[in-house]
Every structure is written in structure tokens, then in C-alpha cells.
Amino acid sequence: MFDRVEIRIKSGDGGSGKVSFRREKFVPYGGPDGGDGGDGGNVYLEADSGLYSLLNFKHKRVHKAANGENGMGSRCTGHNGADLVIKVPVGTVATIVEENGQKRVLADLAADGDRTLVARGGQGGLGNTHFVSSTNQAPMLAQKGQPGGEYELILELKLIADVAIIGYPNVGKSSLLSLLTAAKPRVANYPFTTLSPVMGVVERTEGTFVMAEVPGLIEDAHLGRGLGHDFLRHISRTRMVIHLLDGTSDNPIDDMIKVNSELYLYDASLSERPQVVAVNKIDDELVQLRREELTETFKEAGLEVFFISALTGEGVEVLLDKVAEKLAILKAADAPETETDQEIKVFRPAPKGKMGFHITRLEDGWQVEAPEIERIIEHSDIEDLEVRRQIMVLLKHRNVQQALIKAGAVIGQKIITGRLEWYL
């Protein structure tokens, strides 16, 4: 199973605003009519019950949403970029890798249709109609669209099953699963026959439930030995486990303790999963002879044990009755409470066009960091004297010069704002 992948996602860039003036016969002073740029497309992850692995991402690692279109004349706003919805299997956990290398879990898509926003598209830039003032009736300024977000993303698929069958390699997990369900796992008499988790549906009169065989766990699996890390994480998505033991083993209870220890060392919460213990191969004469001894040993440890044969089906129905009983209790406990007084979240848009700035002292002058103004500079012809004059007026209206003087700047010093160099 292809159940872990690293991809790169990028939301769409915002379209740039337009510098345009109304040109119409008999309207000599039409004024500015440049439209705003469209917003870039967002990137979403959505759980889809029709998908079962992350194989679709094996050969396509980069996923981009569409950019917003640039603004146009006649106050026409550019089209927003189309959103990108990336479909993933139910049970996918998405983790963002920050620039500093730290990882942050973004979402756990545990149900069909679950959707989460991964990267918001860049906001479209403002057209020159937004820069009209009493002193500037013909603005030559427009704003470049914001760039979209770009992230490294780790997708991990964890099984979602009601019951997991765990145990040492070659204890009969595949045989038991194939006996109880229509699943067809690979069955052979050697360790690690099953190399990926296999799921099947158990049908009973009181209902159905999903059962998964987790490939064999061995000592030091929590350190990645064998196929440990690949499979231990799947157990976290199950309600309970059938701990299957080999009745012909020298010490079945010791085998159980070692596997449970691996669960605890990987994730302490896994060792708290409800377990039903079953000893397989009761059809073997040796196991029949040891049955009373094993029953007493497990009883002393406070454990109820079921003896079964995955080969002949002996004892399996009794085991299933116990599993179904425990499962019904767990499902009832997990049922959501019907609350009417739920908090309603209100989402409000961020203020558009807010132009804050930050001043930094340099060796040979000052730097003014003003993202919104820098987007205007980036989109403007700063070699044009009229454009430069209008930018300076804009900086003055934002009290940038006043703040520079207050910070200690003196007349004649060089100021850098984006790609524009100017002097106080």
C-alpha cells in the first residue's frame, strides 16, 4: 500500500490591478476605470471514500491552483482563479513542513467529504480607481496581486477499521481475515507474507463491521525494525484489536507482552485499545494438550482467552460474539451527543487594502517595509516621473515620511521601499 507521500502545493497568485482611463467619444474627462485583479485559487484537501491509497501522488508531486486574472478597463474585475481540490482517501493525515523544518499537523480527514483549506490564494491587486483623490484625478498607480502560498505537505494514510487483527508474523492473521470476510490476503507459511494492511467486512445479523489485518509486528517494531513504523500507525485508527497468538509458540503470553510493549513504545495510547485475546491453531494436537495450561496462565494474568482454528473455523463464532459485544459498547460510547446550543463560528473577511509599514535602519540609509505599497511599486513604471510623484504622495498620505523623521532619519538620506530608492 502506497500510504505516505510528500507533495508540494501552491495556491494561485492574485491578478494585478489595471491602470486604465475611460476613453469614449464626447467624454473628454472620463477618468480612471482600471479594474481590480481576481483572487488566486485556493488549495483544498478533501476525503473521498472511493480512494484507497495515495498512489495517485506517486508521479505527480507538485499541485498548483489557478492564478487570478488581471483587472481590465471599464472597471472590470479579473476572474478569480479556480480552486484546486485534491482528493485523498478517508483516513489521510496532512502535515505541513514549515520553512524552519518543523512539522505541524494541518488536518485529519477521518470522514468522507471532510475538507480543509491548505493554502489560500493571493488577493487580487487594486486598480487605479482606488487611488483617486482630490489632488490626484488621474492616478497612474495600480497594485500587483499577492503571491499565493506554497508549502511542503506530508500525506499519511491511516486505516479506518473497527477491528484490527494484530500479532507476530505467521500466527494466522491472514487466514482468520479470509475466513471471516471476503478479503483475499496472501496466505503462506512464512513470516511477513502480508506486506500491506488488508481490510474486509464482517457480516452478522446485528450488523456489519470492518476488520483489518495489520502485518506482523516484531520486537523493536517501534524503532522501525521489520515493517514496524509502516504498520503501527494504522492501529491508531481502529476501535479495538484481536490479539492473535500462535498456540504452538514456546511462550504465547510472552509473545503477547512483547507486541503490547511495541504498541506502548510507539504510542502509549495504542496499548489502551480494548483487546480480545485469541490463541490460534487449536486444531493442532500440541495446542489441544496445552489448552488447560494456557487457559490457567492467562487467567492468572487476568485475561480471558479464546481458542480458535483459522483453518477449520473452530471457536471462531464464539470469538466473533465477544468482538461484536465489545464493539457495540464502544460504538455507543462514541455516538455524538445531540447538542442544540453549539457555538456558531463567524468568519469575517480581512480588511482589504490596509497599508501598514515597518521601518529598519540600514548602514547607508533606511528601509521601509510596506507590503501593500510595495505591490503598487512592483506593478508601476517607476522610471516615469509622474508615477514616482504619485507614489511619493501616497507615502506622504500614509505618514511614512513623518514616521521616518520620528525614527531619526534626516533630509537627504536614502530610503528603500521594495525596488524603489528615494530620498527624504
From Swiss-Prot:
TM helices/strands, residue ranges: none
This protein's UniProt keywords: Cytoplasm, GTP-binding, Hydrolase, Magnesium, Metal-binding, Nucleotide-binding
Residue stretches making up the OCT domain: 349-424
UniProt binding sites for GTP: 167-174, 192-196, 213-216, 280-283, 309-311
Enzyme class: hydrolase
Cofactor(s) the protein needs: Mg(2+)
Signal peptide: none
Assigned GO CC terms: cytoplasm
Residue ranges of every copy of the OBG-type G domain listed in the record: 161-328
GO terms for MF: GTP binding; GTPase activity; magnesium ion binding
Source taxon at top rank: Bacteria
Residues annotated as domain Obg: 1-160
Keyword S-adenosyl-L-methionine in record: no
A Pfam family: GTP1_OBG
Sequence positions that bind Mg(2+): S174, T194
Subunit structure: Monomer.
Family classification: Belongs to the TRAFAC class OBG-HflX-like GTPase superfamily. OBG GTPase family.
Protein name stated in the entry: GTPase Obg
Classification of source organism: Bacteria, Bacillati, Chloroflexota, Dehalococcoidia, Dehalococcoidales
